[in-house]
Regions:
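Internal transmembrane alpha-helix with an interfacial aromatic "cap," most often the third helix
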Residues: 30-34, 93-126, 134-142, 170
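Membrane-helix boundary/juxtamembrane motif in polytopic membrane proteins
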Residues: 120-125, 150, 171-195, 217
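Helix-loop junctions on the outward
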Residues: 59-92, 141-144
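Alpha-helical transmembrane segments in multipass membrane proteins, preferentially the mid-helix core
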Residues: 28-32, 107, 136, 159-180, ...
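Short aromatic-rich membrane-water interface segments that cap or initiate transmembrane helices
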Residues: 9-13, 81-98, 220-226
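Hydrophobic transmembrane alpha-helical segments in integral membrane proteins
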Residues: 2-26
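Hydrophobic alpha-helical transmembrane segments of multi-pass membrane proteins
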Residues: 25, 47-68, 198-207
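C-terminal transmembrane-bundle signature of multipass membrane proteins
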Residues: 166-169, 188-255
Length: 255
């Protein structure tokens, strides 16, 4: 495997602008969810704070990824990916995910305002499972051996399947007590989360499927960024919508 990916000028600009778009999206959503807290009842503001934390953390890491991409290019359009202290650092994404994925799940539980015991149980199990999912995937991501990638990929899939079970079976059972419209919105929220998460294993499988080189690098950076925007920004805005719906159902006046 080469130490560099030779991009065309168009591919370089595409990734550069895609990462820039990811960065500003995270910043904008952080500001919006912070200033929107007075528009929901106090008990739902924790969910908006968590949403702001998610996009703030992601924004920081996108700034680091953006700078790393620029530094890895040197004076041309070839991106150094290993063998140098200025090589493009993909690990920033994993650091981001291991922090933000558990928080995403916690904010989904927080906005539903479930009974304390139920919320605590769901939170503990989902946080542990999501951390295991990301942590177990990283050794496979950095390995050059396909068999090693497959082993760690399978191990990472186990907590992923458990998260699906909790989201669709256990959390689903609690939605019957939610106000009109909330259950349907939460249902779409779960599908959004699972749909965007599907991008990550597809990108993970690229080397195993023999999809490498320039095109794989471009599609991986594009896919990761779009998935992050959907899973963090759109997810956070949907959390805000649910908080507004529940606040209105409990008597808060629309502004």
């Amino acid at each position: 495997m080469s130490n560099a990916v030779a991009l065309t000028e168009g591919q370089f600009n595409w990734i550069y602008n895609t990462l820039s778009f990811g960065l500003i999206s995270m910043i904008a959503c952080t500001v919006y969810t912070l200033v929107s807290q007075p528009r929901v009842l106090p008990k739902y503001r924790k969910a908006l704070v968590l949403s702001s934390m998610v996009t703030f953390i992601a924004g920081y890491h996108y700034w680091r990824i953006f700078n790393s991409f620029h530094e890895a290019a040197g004076d041309g359009f070839s991106i150094t990916i290993k063998g140098s202290n200025t090589a493009f650092n993909e690990a920033y994404r994993y650091v981001d995910w291991i922090l933000t994925v558990p928080l995403l799940l916690v904010e989904a539980i927080a906005v539903l305002a479930l009974a304390k015991e139920v919320a605590a149980s769901l939170t503990t199990r989902l946080v542990i499972a999501s951390a295991l999912m990301i942590g177990l995937g990283y050794p496979g991501e950095i390995s050059m051996d396909n068999n090693t990638k497959i082993i760690w990929g399978v191990l990472s899939t186990i907590p992923f399947l458990y998260i699906l079970y909790v989201l669709f079976r256990e959390l689903g059972a609690s939605l019957e007590r939610q106000p009109a419209g909330v259950a349907a919105t939460v249902g779409r929220l779960r599908l959004l989360l699972i749909g965007t998460w599907g991008v990550y294993p597809i990108s993970y499988l690229f080397p195993i499927l023999g999809i490498e080189g320039t095109d794989a690098f471009v599609w991986r950076q594009t896919g990761y960024t779009i998935a992050d925007i959907l899973a963090k920004c759109v997810f956070g805005l949907t959390i805000y919508k649910i908080a507004r719906m529940k606040s209105a159902a409990e008597g808060m006046k629309e502004d």
